[in-house]
């Protein structure tokens, strides 16, 4: 596998007479097969909520989705299953998939509903099981819950009992450092979208919403297709600029595809900016958008920075590989005329849709329904410019409900969050 790495500015031409110019830098990355390369072995862990609220049809449909996923695993793939409620336990220890029927039987025999929702304990066991099969494989977890983690009790400055939500985020970050990807699936209407989004973002995965039980099979299959497309893992973007070029200070970099995520930026000992991206898929670009400022440089085509990807290749069992160093160009001219890039504009709009929705949610939390409605209407208009008709429907519906004095249901809130993060075409 090799890395496809392309960069572009929203406007390639820069006014050389200006002391400072702002630009949006789009960086797209994907894995490229070299010759005939087979799909990488998978190392999957399913972390499933078996609390009492999941009993009956919800659990039955989840088990149906799990069985269909098992049927798609290939020889050499690995599976493990964790169940959690008031406590967490290993249902299927990490193993090579050889006898699917035996695994399915164990799932049916060992499943049982109980009280409580200790998400962090389930996630911790899942990480432990995944680590048993990481060599030469794509290691990912599917974490499904229909509830909220136990936050314990806080009295003034003292925390009494474990804060499950806080520990979940710590574990997701730990998983990312161990080259494990955590995907989250919210089931029904009563799960914590803030928590599951943060877990997926920190764990390099994606957030899915199962509104009705019959959607479980579809959402599991959608995530599984993404896992099958992974060609390279543990990818980090290395970004450096020439003197006079810098990142914006506030929220300078975000991923805009395949999901929108605000990305944390670190700086290494050499001053290079480092961003963890996670897995790179074949034929599906991961797109990052950086907000940069350019100082004055001489007229002509100038190198304003360099890009490189550091990654692992499971097929070769090699870590820390580097793609060729790629220059970033801008054309400085005193006879400035815009040279706009329509693809970068799409990336700008994707990020705008997400941030506009975030602002709407913040206003709603403060009781400003009118302000929230205005921002959701703006986000719907942005989605219309992108051509994301499904998001337009969701965002417009939420805006309209607020405009006429109605509250957003839990389902509305979750649909709105998903619409803000993704292009709803899958």
Residue ranges, per PLM feature:
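Local beta-strand/beta-hairpin segments that build beta-sheet-rich folds
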Residues: 91-93, 287, 301-306
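Long, acidic serine/threonine- and proline-rich intrinsically disordered regions
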Residues: 294-426
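Extracellular adhesion/glycan-binding regions together with long Ser/Thr-
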Residues: 258-284
């Amino acid at each position: 596998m090799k890395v496809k790495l392309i960069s572009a500015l929203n406007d390639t031409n820069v006014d050389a007479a200006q002391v400072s110019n702002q630009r949006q830098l789009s960086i797209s990355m994907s894995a490229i097969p070299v010759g005939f390369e087979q799909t990488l072995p998978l190392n999957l862990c399913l972390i499933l909520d078996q609390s009492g609220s999941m009993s009956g049809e919800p659990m039955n449909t989840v088990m149906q989705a799990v069985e269909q996923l098992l049927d798609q695993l290939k020889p050499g793939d690995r599976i493990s299953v964790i169940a959690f409620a008031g406590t967490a336990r290993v249902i299927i220890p990490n193993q090579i998939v050889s006898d699917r029927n035996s695994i399915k039987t164990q799932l049916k025999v060992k499943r049982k509903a109980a009280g409580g929702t200790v998400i962090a304990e389930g996630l911790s066991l899942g990480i432990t099981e995944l680590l048993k099969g990481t060599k030469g494989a794509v290691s990912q977890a599917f974490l499904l819950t229909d509830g909220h983690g136990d936050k314990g009790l806080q009295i003034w400055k003292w925390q009494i009992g474990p804060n499950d939500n806080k520990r979940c985020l710590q574990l997701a970050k730990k998983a990312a450092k161990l080259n494990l990807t955590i995907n989250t699936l919210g089931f029904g209407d009563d799960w914590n979208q803030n928590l599951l989004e943060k877990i997926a973002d920190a764990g390099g995965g994606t957030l899915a919403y199962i509104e009705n039980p019959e959607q479980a099979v579809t959402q599991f299959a959608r995530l599984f297709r993404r896992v099958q497309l992974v060609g390279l893992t543990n990818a980090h973007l290395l970004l450096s600029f020439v003197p006079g070029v810098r990142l914006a200070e506030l929220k300078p970099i975000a991923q805009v595809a395949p999901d929108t995520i605000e990305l944390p930026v670190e700086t290494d000992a050499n001053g290079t900016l480092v961003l963890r991206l996670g897995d790179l898929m074949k034929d599906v670009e991961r797109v990052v958008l950086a907000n940069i400022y350019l100082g004055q440089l001489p007229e002509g085509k100038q190198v304003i920075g360099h890009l490189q990807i550091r990654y692992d290749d499971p097929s070769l069992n090699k870590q820390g590989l580097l793609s060729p160093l790629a220059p970033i160009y801008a054309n400085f001219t005193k006879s400035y005329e815009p040279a706009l890039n329509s693809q970068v504009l799409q990336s700008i709009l994707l990020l705008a849709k997400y941030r506009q929705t975030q602002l709407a949610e913040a206003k709603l939390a403060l009781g400003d329904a009118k302000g929230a409605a205005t921002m959701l209407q703006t986000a719907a208009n942005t989605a219309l410019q992108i051509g994301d008709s499904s998001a337009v429907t969701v965002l417009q519906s939420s805006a309209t409900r607020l405009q006429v004095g109605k509250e957003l249901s839990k389902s509305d809130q979750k649909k709105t969050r998903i619409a803000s993060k993704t292009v709803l075409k899958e």
